[in-house]
């Protein structure tokens, strides 16, 4: 009887420890497993089809649908505050006009965000700090346009306890990354972006594998006629995960969201099955998630 109670006690503790693990910790365990067989989903600027891009609602929607990472863009205001905004100007995505760097945060907070159809909504421009607090423990964030002022970004990460939530990416050489970003390489995830259509793509990958051993590479190529695409996927297998973007047709040999709407096996399926892709950034996260569940890849 005591043995039975003991076994049930251990089982209870095990279940409790799994439940206590945050969603971010679960995602990180997959990111750091080069043999991971599930596919991680990245929502480009959040769920922008159903909420304004780079808004807290777009991020919340992505969390609720089960997305793993949201890609967001960071800009700096006149008074040095970091906000979410893709463009250097306010015109396209807000009710304001002019350059972000010429507006102070309090003034930007009086504006409303526009949706994908350029219609005014109730949503405000979020600060990076507000975003980090919404994401905390629930989803990871890929910060775009934040490289040049990452010292300030990192202060907010430490303040909010979200340093382990962040993915940074860039197309610089390994030497440049070590020189410019070196003090953060053991604190946040850094992924190289490699354009496979460029002459020294393979050497760049080899350099990063040798010196930094990144958890993943973001790869780009225009056409399946590129002879090294499959070679690179084979090289990275068991070493680093492969990330492709399906936002438009020139980013992944035409195997994009549009192709996937017509034939998902030729779009997403090709990237996953033929190129061993384990991270996909998409403008259609709900559609991709449904496909992955159907394929038992979630």
Residue spans of the language-model regions?
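Bacterial Sec-dependent N-terminal signal peptides
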Residues: 1-24
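Phosphate-group recognition and catalysis centered on beta-loop-alpha active-site segments
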Residues: 20-298
